[in-house]
Regions:
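C-terminal regions of proteins
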Residues: 277, 281, 288-324
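Short, charged, surface-exposed secondary-structure boundary motifs
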Residues: 42-47, 195-202, 298-301
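C-terminal hydrophobic structural anchor segments
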Residues: 236-284, 288
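Gly/Ser/Thr-rich loops at beta-strand to alpha-helix junctions
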Residues: 10-17, 165-172, 264-271
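Gly/lys/ser-thr-rich phosphate-binding loops in alpha/beta enzymes
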Residues: 1-70
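Redox- and metal-dependent alpha/beta enzyme cores, enriched for Fe-S-associated oxidoreductases
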Residues: 166-238, 242-245
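A charged, amphipathic alpha-helical module
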Residues: 57-197, 235
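Extended, charge-rich low-complexity interaction segments
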Residues: 1, 62-85, 214-240, 316-324
Length: 324
């Protein structure tokens, strides 16, 4: 890998991230660095108050303009407004299709599993402004819609429907296939959840970005950010969702329970899991929390974790019988 000309960083979610690139740029590579400033309104802020809206939009606007100035200075090129408008247009369309795919997963039987969700996020995270992402999510939407129309699910018989909280063990997405052999489907995930799409006027794409950033953050805040204010940050990466949205998911996705992965190498994505467990308990919905890692297989004990899932399914079955 060659030496970069400059570095772009962010303090979003992961508390040491802000210092990582700063340390690399000042102590190792000696290159310029720009760190974006996260936006995290308090969970109890009145997001309908125009004064609060203008305060945070001014922060977003200043940060974005500073980043543009930094990039123009480093590259010697001016921002191509037309290209930026095209990127914004593509991202709005791609996000809309992706959101509709997740809405289709409310169907019974569920047409798309978590193992596919965690692989289908890649264009959303890295190619959202490209036409390739629009084409990908449009085709995915059509495929999943056809499955729903035909009543085709991932597994022949769904016994349990779950929500997933946290980052998955990337080295073992087959975990979701194992759950499916037990009749359990993960139908919705909190991490990387795209949220309701926001359409904005792109006459001035920079200001459109500011508005979309604010509206996205506002939506996330109003869905509950009491456990982790960073979830209302506008970045497409999301560590989780709020309590109000979780409550809605229980009914909309007909969830019988939830599974949370407490991952050792990304603490931020584990924040609020006990809080969410308490919220679900009030609704009579059980939730299990298991611990391992998202990238280190040494933290994985296959027999032990599978036994935890088997025990949890017995609890879920008991809850279902009590409700029937």
């Amino acid at each position: 890998m060659g030496t970069p000309s400059f570095l772009l960083g962010s303090g979003l979610i992961c508390e040491p991230r802000f210092k990582w690139f700063q340390a690399i740029a000042t102590h190792f590579l000696k290159v310029p660095v720009f760190n974006d400033d996260p936006v995290s309104p308090p969970y109890d802020a009145d997001m309908e108050d125009p004064r609060i809206a203008e305060h945070y939009k001014a922060q977003i606007r200043a940060s974005l303009n500073a980043q543009i100035a930094f990039l123009e200075g480093q590259t010697g090129k001016k921002l191509d407004i037309g290209r930026f408008r095209e990127i914004m247009k593509n991202s709005q369309e791609a996000i809309r299709y992706w959101y509709e795919v997740l809405e289709l997963r409310k169907a019974v039987p569920c047409p798309m599993g978590s193992e596919d969700y965690f692989t289908a996020i890649i264009p959303f995270l890295y190619l959202a402004g490209e036409r390739e992402a629009v084409d990908f999510y449009r085709d995915l939407y059509r495929e999943v819609k056809e499955r729903v129309d035909r009543g085709v699910g991932v597994i022949p018989e769904e016994r349990y429907r779950f929500g997933w909280l946290g980052i998955p063990p990337w080295f073992n997405l087959g975990l979701f296939n194992y759950l499916q052999t037990l009749g359990a489907m993960v139908c919705i995930e909190s991490t990387y959840y795209v949220g309701h799409p926001v359409e904005v006027d792109l006459t001035d794409p920079v200001e459109g970005w500011v508005e979309r950033t604010w509206q996205t953050g506002k939506f996330k805040n109003q869905q509950g950010s009491e456990a982790n204010p960073d979830i209302c940050n506008p970045g497409v990466f999301n560590p989780g969702v709020g309590g109000e949205l979780i409550k809605r998911w229980v009914s909309e996705y007909r969830l019988d329970g939830a599974i949370a992965h407490r991952t050792r190498s990304c603490r931020a994505t584990s924040m609020g899991q006990l809080h969410m467990k308490n919220i679900l308990a009030e609704l009579g919905v059980p939730m299990m929390i298991f611990e391992s890692d998202m990238v280190d297989p040494r933290a994985w004990s296959d027999a032990q974790i599978k036994r935890q899932f088997q025990d949890f399914l017995e609890i879920v079955e008991t809850h279902k019988k009590r409700k029937s």
